[in-house]
């Protein structure tokens, strides 16, 4: 208790250093804790799974096209997993653009079709009702979706009309797990509701202990035919992928972005690096300022050692003082986190709730940080000669060197973060301002067709009715004066597409992405034809012609379309006499997705019309409101509901760069925090250093030194430290930038102005911190100082 009081008394005597030290550490801890909470949330995705490392999905690879699927839907030359090794097995089907009808309202829904075994593998909290799918009509709603439909009414037992025309009954309301989840849905439907859904299912397995997963993967690596090779020679392989790994492989789920989240290891490494650098900045600042405060007690420690104080007592004093400071800083940091919770959640696009991890993290900081920060001061004073401690209070040259070393290390980190911040903001600007190579203005992606996802619900009559509704949509769109062009499809120009191998006239194999289109597609997006001509194809003429982009023409080994042709490898294997189909036109390259992914060699099978629920619509500039009103009325006329989903292409493109924007913003914010923390450290050190030099300054003034001379003298040491830190930070920043962006097809240049701006920014802010103290020192009264020193 006596030691605690002694420690508290010392901290109160050194109020300036205590406050500066506390604020610097609090800012550092607040930033680091925010980042660590986000990183922890990313690393614990899908922990609601009973065992995410040992629950596996089937990942199929069909000639270069990977995706999650199942084995039971392959009916030819396939293999099944031996049920003797299976502890539990379930399937799910994601239906991203589905809907239900409540009264007269059509409400978009992300539906997950599965069975009750799914809940044996994934634990969801039950808010109301029961967590089961006992009947084909059973349905479970998320708490948020139930509130959207029913408000404050009790939803249990309510009946909704599903898109296939069948009634479903709400039997339970599920809450959100504490962890982040890969699969996100609004409604869970029973797989018994239909036997023929719109898309294939994905199988999930939990195996019995001792099952050889490698042996199963080895068996799956053998190519097998999908269908009868007389007609279709495509093959597929399969492997098992754990639930834990699915999140980190976005290519498996990128066609349903509204239902599946994916992670980015590179992004997480960046955040981890920023977190580590900020924490290190705070710790260095803390140790440095604490050492400055201890320098005033060198004589005191020397006398204590003369009178027999042992090393344990000395360490206890230092450790308790650091613990009090760390505890205070930790409390302030959590206060900052709470105050900044709204902007933090906006920045990271997630809701942070308090979990056990927060408690463990705080306890770890409180236990470890005081020990870490006490080691160097303890070694310094425990092994310093008592005589040396008594004779000198902070005048040793090595003490000054260590202070400058710690300060320089802080500024190396600060310069590094500032340079990275400037670069990634420039990279973001380039991504947002670089034209993708196609028209982006005044184009909408609209879901106009709302039909059943249950294929078993269709009869001949219902199919005819569906065709009539789609024809009505097309006729009305053709008659609208505000609509220039439209293209029905299953995906828009940004949607990831599949591909396959094609052969050129030399029999060489080339993998090309496939994008089905009509002649209107190229006009709608203003994609320039650079060679040949895309013919007008009417509905009666069902032929398909091939168009390629420049990248595909080059990949195929052609320089012109003269004599150029392709054939799908699958077709050639099925019939060796199949001839090449000519390439009729070449179009300009464009970026189909994120600019950093580059331009993909693409082939366009061009036909009269391709069906799909998604309409890409180019409208007259300035007529956005009129077009939306027209489409709303059209939906009501065709489907009896004004509800429909739409986005604007410009917004979709901006959304692609959400993570890039987040990275740039994080660097900017935390680089600013690093400057503040380092400036606080500089302020604390200068308070001590400049005060120690008052006698020297007084003598220089007596000998005729001007204020300009004193400014130069006092600034010089700190300027030198900043310049050295900057010189060291330049190659580090350059290396990190080049390492991270080496695979980017489009990246901003690393120009010298980024480094110059960072140098000026840090120097101006940091030395501005010193201005008042140096001005005060330059105008001291020499007589008064000589009397008091």
Task: Mark where each language-model region is.
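Alpha-helical transmembrane segments
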Residues: 27-56, 340-347, 413-442, 740-745
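Hydrophobic alpha-helical bundles that form the membrane domains of multi-pass transporters
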Residues: 260-341, 345-346, 360
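Membrane-helix entry/capping segments
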Residues: 2-4, 9, 13-14, 223-275, ...
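Mid-to-C-terminal secondary-structure elements
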Residues: 115-127, 139-263, 475-655
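Small-residue-rich transmembrane alpha-helices
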Residues: 30, 34, 288, 322-386, ...
């Amino acid at each position: 208790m006596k030691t605690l009081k002694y420690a508290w008394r010392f901290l109160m005597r050194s109020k300036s250093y205590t406050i500066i030290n506390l604020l610097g550490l609090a800012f550092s801890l607040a930033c680091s804790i925010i980042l660590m909470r986000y990183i922890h949330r990313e690393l614990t995705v899908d922990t609601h799974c009973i065992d995410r490392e040992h629950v596996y999905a089937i990942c199929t690879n069909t000639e270069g096209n990977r995706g999650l699927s199942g084995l039971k839907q392959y009916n030819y030359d396939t293999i099944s997993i031996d049920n003797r090794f299976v502890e539990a097995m379930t399937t799910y089907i994601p239906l991203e653009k589905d809907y239900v009808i409540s009264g007269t309202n059509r409400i978009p829904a992300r539906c997950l079709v599965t069975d009750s075994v799914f809940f044996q593998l994934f634990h969801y909290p039950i808010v109301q009702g029961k967590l089961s799918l006992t009947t084909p009509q059973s349905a479970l709603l998320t708490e948020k979706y139930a509130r959207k439909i029913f408000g404050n009414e009790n939803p249990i037992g309510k009946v909704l009309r599903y898109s296939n025309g069948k009634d479903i009954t709400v039997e339970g309301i599920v809450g959100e797990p504490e962890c982040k989840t890969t699969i996100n849905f609004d409604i869970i439907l029973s797989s018994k509701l239909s036997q023929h859904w719109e898309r294939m299912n994905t199988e999930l397995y939990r195996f019995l202990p001792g099952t050889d997963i490698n042996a199963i993967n080895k068996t799956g690596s053998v190519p097998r035919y999908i269908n009868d090779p007389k007609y279709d020679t495509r093959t597929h392989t399969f492997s098992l992928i754990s639930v834990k790994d699915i999140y980190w492989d976005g290519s498996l789920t990128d066609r349903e972005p509204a239902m599946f989240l994916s992670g980015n290891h590179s992004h997480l490494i960046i955040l981890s690096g920023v977190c580590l650098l900020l924490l290190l900045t705070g710790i260095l600042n803390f140790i440095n300022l604490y050492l400055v405060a201890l320098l005033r007690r060198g004589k005191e420690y020397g006398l204590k050692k003369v009178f027999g104080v042992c090393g344990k007592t000395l360490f206890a004093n230092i450790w308790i003082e650091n613990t009090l400071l760390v505890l205070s800083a930790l409390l302030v940091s959590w206060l900052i986190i709470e105050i900044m919770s709204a902007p933090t959640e906006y920045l990271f696009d997630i809701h942070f709730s308090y979990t056990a991890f927060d408690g463990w993290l705080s306890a770890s900081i409180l236990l470890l940080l005081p020990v870490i920060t006490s080691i160097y001061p303890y070694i310094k004073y425990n092994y310093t000669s008592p005589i040396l401690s008594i004779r000198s209070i902070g005048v040793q040259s090595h003490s000054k060197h260590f202070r400058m070393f710690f300060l320089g290390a802080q500024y190396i980190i600060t310069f590094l973060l500032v340079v990275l911040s400037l670069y990634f903001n420039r990279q973001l600007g380039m991504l947002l301002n670089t034209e993708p190579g196609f028209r982006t203005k005044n184009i909408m992606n609209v879901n106009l067709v709302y039909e059943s996802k249950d294929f078993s619900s269709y009869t001949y009559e219902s199919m005819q009715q569906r065709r009539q509704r789609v024809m009505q949509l097309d006729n009305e769109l053709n008659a609208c004066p505000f609509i220039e062009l439209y293209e029905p499809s299953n995906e828009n120009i940004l949607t990831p597409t599949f591909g396959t191998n094609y052969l050129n006239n030399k029999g060489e194999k080339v993998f090309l992405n496939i994008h089905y289109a009509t002649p209107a597609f190229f006009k709608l997006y203003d994609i320039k034809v650079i060679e040949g001509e895309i013919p007008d194809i009417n509905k009666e003429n069902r032929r398909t012609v091939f168009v390629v982009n420049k990248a595909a023409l080059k990949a195929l080994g052609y320089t012109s379309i003269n004599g150029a042709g392709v054939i799908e490898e699958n077709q050639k294997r099925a019939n060796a006499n199949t001839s090449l189909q000519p390439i009729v036109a070449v179009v300009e390259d464009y970026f189909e997705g994120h600019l950093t992914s580059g331009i993909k060699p693409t082939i366009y099978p061009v036909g009269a019309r391709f069906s799909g629920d998604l309409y890409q619509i180019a409208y007259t500039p300035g007529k956005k409101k009129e077009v939306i009103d027209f489409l709303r009325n059209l939906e009501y006329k065709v489907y009896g509901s004004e509800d429909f989903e739409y986005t604007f292409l410009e917004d979709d493109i901006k959304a692609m760069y959400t993570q890039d924007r987040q990275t740039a913003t994080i660097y900017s914010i935390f680089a600013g925090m690093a400057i503040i923390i380092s400036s606080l450290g500089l302020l604390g050190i200068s308070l001590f250093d400049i005060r120690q030099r008052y006698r020297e300054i007084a003598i220089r003034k007596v000998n005729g030194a001007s204020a300009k001379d004193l400014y130069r003298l006092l600034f010089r040491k700190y300027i030198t430290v900043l310049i050295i830190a900057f010189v060291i930070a330049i190659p580090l920043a350059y290396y990190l930038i080049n390492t991270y962006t080496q695979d980017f097809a489009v990246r901003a240049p690393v120009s010298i102005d980024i480094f110059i701006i960072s140098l000026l920014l840090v120097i101006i802010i940091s030395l501005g911190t010193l201005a008042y103290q140096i001005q005060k020192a330059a105008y001291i009264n020499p007589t008064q100082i000589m009397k008091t020193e």
